[in-house]
Amino acid sequence: MAMSGFGTHVRHQPSAAIIDLQGEINTLAENVLNAAYDEAVSQQPEVILLNFSQVDYINSTGIALVVGLLKRARQAGLPLIAYGLSEHYVEIFQITRLADFMPLFPDEGTAWRAIAIWVERV
């Protein structure tokens, strides 16, 4: 699913959905991003992971779109986890306090290990 420099791919795993993001997250990404989220929750996952490893650019509107996904996930009682952000965007997520509400991990393997530890504690 691609649109003006942005695309997604949703992968379903047992109890989780991973949304692979590619390209630029800006105004043009809104419909594609929301459709990917809808597809991800259609399988009733226990957690959603956002894979930013192929994201080239996120503008302020893109940050707002991520906040919108976070809001939807929180309303549904779903943890939203991000991984693969560049150092620059990790810093932006920390400055904007998104990282306070959405755990950030360097890669998918690290995110899965954290999820496994979290599941053991619950």
What does each model-identified segment do?
Residues 104-122:
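A charged, well-structured terminal subsegment
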Residues 27-101:
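Amphipathic alpha-helical interaction surfaces in cytosolic regulatory modules
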